Amino acid sequence: MKNIFKKKIFPSLTLLEIDPAHPFPFIINQGRALVMKLKKKKKKRILNSIIVIPKALSRFIEIDGGKSFKKFLVLDDVIGYFASEIFPDHLLEKKMIFRVIRDSDVEIQEEAEDLVRSFELALKRRRTGDIVRLEILEKSDKELVKFITN
């Protein structure tokens, strides 16, 4: 599994530090991300980081289950498991996967002069709509939930 992570998953990830100089990243509609609280190993400096999980990666990873059945791992779990390898100089204190659902209603006025242009604008707004739902696990860490919602 480590080999799959290093060769296929890790190169596709974007690691983002969140601080006053690096604001919270934009998460696309139905986008998933891993938020982490890390501590520098030799210092007490805290680092908050987000890994936006690319939609291009398959959500499930097939692993060898023998001849009789197939085994799969969830991509989010694999990334979370190897989080400490992504930041080797840090200790992983907390982590949480979340998913963003954005307002994707499309309103088109039939009497618009340029119907094609109206559709183009509506589709652009659809990708960047307001967040209407945040999906987290029930047992998620309250501190990390507060961090991503503020």
Q: Can you annotate each of these PLM segments?
A:
Residues 1-150:
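N-terminal non-catalytic structural scaffold regions of very large proteins
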